[in-house]
Amino acid sequence: MRVTNRSLKGREGEIAVTAETLDDLWHLKYIIEKGDLVFSVTKRKADSASDKIRPEKVEKVKVRLGIRVDDLEFHKFANRLRLHGMIERGMDVGSYHTLNIEIGTNLSVIKEHWKNDQLQRIKDAEEASKRPKVVMVAIEEGDADIGFVHHYGIEIYSHIRQSSGKRETGLRNEFFREVVEQLRHAVPEEASIVIAGPGFTKEDFIKYFQETEPAMASKALIEDTSMIGMSGFQEVLRRGAVDRIMQESRIARESALMEDLIREISMDGKAAYGLGDVKNALNFGAVETLLVADETLREGREKGEDIDKLLREVEQAQGKVVVFSTAFEPGEKLHKLGGIAALLRFKVRG
């Protein structure tokens, strides 16, 4: 997500963003609420006097509208967030319209009060767009390219070449050593790695990688490509390997937290689930990590429940808040447990 304008007085005001990924659309589903004023460029029928005489001639024109949101739907498989509401700014004020927010859409969101988790979501999404979550190595005998996968495209980090001695073990290992050394400097701690290329060089390299950097190599997977360089990177993207990695990394983090929660619950240990038990634990200052399902957060706000007060109190007590996606299994499990739970600093009796 790219923030293009931020104009806040305290917690009131406007933030303008560009949605760059499907994840950004998912974030926006939980940032935008009923009652927000949202501006974006859209298409709407331009009704002139002649159009009304011959309605078959009515054409849609591009206009910038501001609507007061009264309903929103995230269509995951259509890659679209739909915002429905009454037009307050632009043409046909007082009529209803639906804004289709897609990847690449620019929009402005105006709120009377921005909540902590909404601002944090924007910050997290903005930071995620700047750092690579996946590093790719396209390698063949004597040649390797390292690239970063960003939301806006692929950035070539380095090219390593060994022009001769490909059959000499010492020189080949020296080439592999140089690639590994570049990766030590290039790979952020949370990033995954794709090793790609034609032939068997990539398999030989991954063995060397596992021997010299086992922790980093454990995050790597292998993909076949017909060539190296930018064309090889594009092959990896077309096959969907990067999308799978980025989705799986989130699922893995949320799965680990759910495993911790289930284990503590089964031991009658340092865990609480359900709103009542979580509030009780919070009163004792015991909440270390609050787990809340995105649907529970949205439903609570729509019903007027002060769920945000609970989130603020956890943060004020130096606790961490993790919002789970119910689009994935860990989030579904959490939702079935009441949508809210906590890992505790110490055991609390109910």
Swiss-Prot record:
Superkingdom assignment: Archaea
One of the GO BP terms on file: nuclear-transcribed mRNA catabolic process, no-go decay
Molecular function in Gene Ontology: endonuclease activity; metal ion binding
Keywords: Cytoplasm, Endonuclease, Hydrolase, Metal-binding, Nuclease
Pfam family membership, one: eRF1_3
Principal location class: cytoplasm
EC assignment: 3.1.-.-
InterPro entries: eFR1_2_sf (IPR042226), eRF1_1_Pelota (IPR005140), eRF1_2 (IPR005141), eRF1_3 (IPR005142), Pelota/DOM34_N (IPR038069), Pelota_arc (IPR023521), Ribosomal_eL30-like_sf (IPR029064), Transl-rel_pelota (IPR004405)
Protein's cellular compartments: Cytoplasm
Cofactor: a divalent metal cation
GO cellular component: cytoplasm
EC category: hydrolase
SMART domains: eRF1_1
Record-stated family: Belongs to the eukaryotic release factor 1 family. Pelota subfamily.
Domain remarks: The N-terminal domain has the RNA-binding Sm fold. It harbors the endoribonuclease activity.
Assembly and oligomerization: Monomer.
Described function: May function in recognizing stalled ribosomes, interact with stem-loop structures in stalled mRNA molecules, and effect endonucleolytic cleavage of the mRNA. May play a role in the release non-functional ribosomes and degradation of damaged mRNAs. Has endoribonuclease activity.
HAMAP family in UniProt: PelO
Record protein name field: Protein pelota homolog
